[in-house]
């Protein structure tokens, strides 16, 4: 079993890649399904998922993933860990969320963190260095797509295909 797949152009080459989390690895696959890179994962549920966002505005997506012990931000091209923060969870069907929750014009990372039987909390992570790019203030569901919901949380009468909007072409 694996969590929900994340599809994005992680390396800016114009072709989408696929991020899948299994019991032991977060793996990024090229469009021909060859492995681009993989990183060890500690996910006993086998149901967590990664998120993609270009925090730096360089055209290359970062991969954000939290397993049972750690929230990590990976370079989408190489798989190098850019940031690693302690954030435990028993894991189930969950993934980090990217939204501008404090309306400061910068993206934040939101995820659940707990110590398996103790305090449970939702944690918001912000950039401590260069400001992150702006993003929407809305993330309404596990199956979020920017064109599925309006900023005021109403449902669009006619949805635009997000594949037609390059910056939003992340699934």
Task: Label the predicted regions.
Residues 12-21, 57-66, 103-112:
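Acidic/hydrophobic-patterned starts of short beta strands in beta-sheet-rich repeat architectures
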Residues 1-6, 40-51, 86-97, 145, ...:
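Repeat-based blade/solenoid architectures
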Residues 30-33, 76-78, 128-129:
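Short loop/turn segments that connect beta-strands within beta-propeller blades
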Residues 46-73, 91-98, 117:
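Loop/turn-rich, solvent-exposed surfaces of beta-rich toroidal or solenoidal domains
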Residues 96-171:
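Blade-level signature of beta-propeller repeat domains, shared across WD40, Kelch, NHL, RCC1
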Residues 24-30, 70-72, 117-126:
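Structural motif
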Residues 36-37, 82-83:
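A structural motif specific to WD40 beta-propellers
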Residues 3-10, 48-56, 83, 94-103, ...:
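Beta-propeller blade termini
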């Amino acid at each position: 079993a694996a969590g929900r797949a994340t599809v994005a152009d992680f390396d800016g080459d114009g072709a989408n890649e696929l991020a899948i989390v299994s019991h032991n690895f977060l793996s990024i696959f090229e469009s021909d399904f060859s492995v681009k890179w993989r990183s060890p994962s500690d996910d006993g549920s086998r149901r967590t998922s990664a998120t993609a966002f270009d925090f730096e505005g360089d055209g290359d997506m970062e991969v954000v993933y939290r397993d049972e012990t750690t929230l990590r931000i990976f370079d989408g091209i190489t798989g190098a860990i850019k940031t690693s923060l302690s954030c435990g969870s028993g894991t189930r069907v969950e993934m980090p969320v990217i939204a501008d929750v404090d309306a400061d014009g910068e993206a934040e990372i939101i995820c659940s963190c707990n110590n398996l039987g103790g305090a449970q909390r939702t944690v918001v992570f912000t950039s401590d260095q260069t400001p992150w790019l702006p993003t929407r203030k809305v993330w309404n569901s596990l199956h979020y797509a920017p064109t599925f919901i309006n900023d005021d949380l109403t449902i669009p009468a006619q949805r635009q295909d997000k594949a037609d909007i390059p910056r939003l072409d992340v699934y």
